[in-house]
């Protein structure tokens, strides 16, 4: 474990790792500071960074297992101590590190009796196991067990969907989250208008990334999210009559509207009321207040006209078009 005294600079904004330790192969801890910050900045950065650490960093997981020995995922196999469900749960907990993109195959092929651990997984070159001792199954008899695995890199959660299992393939709930937890706290110092803040960030990871690596990746991902705002074309913004106006992108509204008119007769639009479209209540009420009662009324409005409706959002245009195209 490494500890250092906290020194606060009153000049340049700096970050520093003040504590770092490895509690086990699958649990790393890091504590970082960023200072000096103006009042309110620490909370802004802390909230954004925590969300990026927990939701924007990619991880690698086993997402599917396949074996001819397995009739269904709640069965028991003669010669194996664990149920199939328990084996799938153990595979779910295997911690992997990779730089792969897409899906890769891996394999377990073992002859009993004996213990099956993560060490027995035959991996593609781009993937490594963090803890080879992680338990998978116990073979109590001299049987052969072969399990094909699918490995993916992603972020967030991937919950297994219902499957007919006809190919003896079983999806596994995946948690693509190398950061297990992240907290931030704030220390204020100074008086009055001179008050400044220190941001403390605590990060726990599963060992596939160090806390420092996670901090760097989360920072890069946050920067990438904001980059589009730095390249907004000036000609899309203009002032008129002392009001801020924005020229909206066409969206695919115009093209999709043309396609709709080709598919359906315009006369029919006149007799289809918006009550029949099963619109969300908020969108329905906005349209009714603007005297839009039929589908023809709706389609005679441009995207810009719709956006001017009070409480109507640009996302609502897409939602309406999606509903219309299904009709």
UniProtKB/Swiss-Prot annotation:
Matches recorded under Pfam families: RNA_pol_A_bac, RNA_pol_A_CTD, RNA_pol_L
Presence of keyword Nucleotidyltransferase: yes
Subcellular location: Plastid, Chloroplast
Residue segments, region Alpha C-terminal domain (alpha-CTD): 267-327
Cross-referenced SUPFAM superfamilies: C-terminal domain of RNA polymerase alpha subunit (SSF47789), Insert subdomain of RNA polymerase alpha subunit (SSF56553), RBP11-like subunits of RNA polymerase (SSF55257)
InterPro entries in alphabetical order: DNA-dir_RNA_pol_insert, DNA-dir_RNA_pol_RpoA/D/Rpb3, DNA-dir_RpoA, RBP11-like, RNAP_asu_C, RNApol_insert_sf
Catalysis performed (reactions): RNA(n) + a ribonucleoside 5'-triphosphate = RNA(n+1) + diphosphate
EC number from the UniProt entry: 2.7.7.6
Region span, Alpha N-terminal domain (alpha-NTD): 1-233
Top-level EC class: transferase
Entry's Gene Ontology molecular function annotations: DNA binding; DNA-directed RNA polymerase activity; protein dimerization activity
Domain of life of the source: Eukaryota
Function recorded in the entry: DNA-dependent RNA polymerase catalyzes the transcription of DNA into RNA using the four ribonucleoside triphosphates as substrates.
Domain commentary: The N-terminal domain is essential for RNAP assembly and basal transcription, whereas the C-terminal domain is involved in interaction with transcriptional regulators and with upstream promoter elements.
Subunit structure: In plastids the minimal PEP RNA polymerase catalytic core is composed of four subunits: alpha, beta, beta', and beta''. When a (nuclear-encoded) sigma factor is associated with the core the holoenzyme is formed, which can initiate transcription.
Name of protein: DNA-directed RNA polymerase subunit alpha
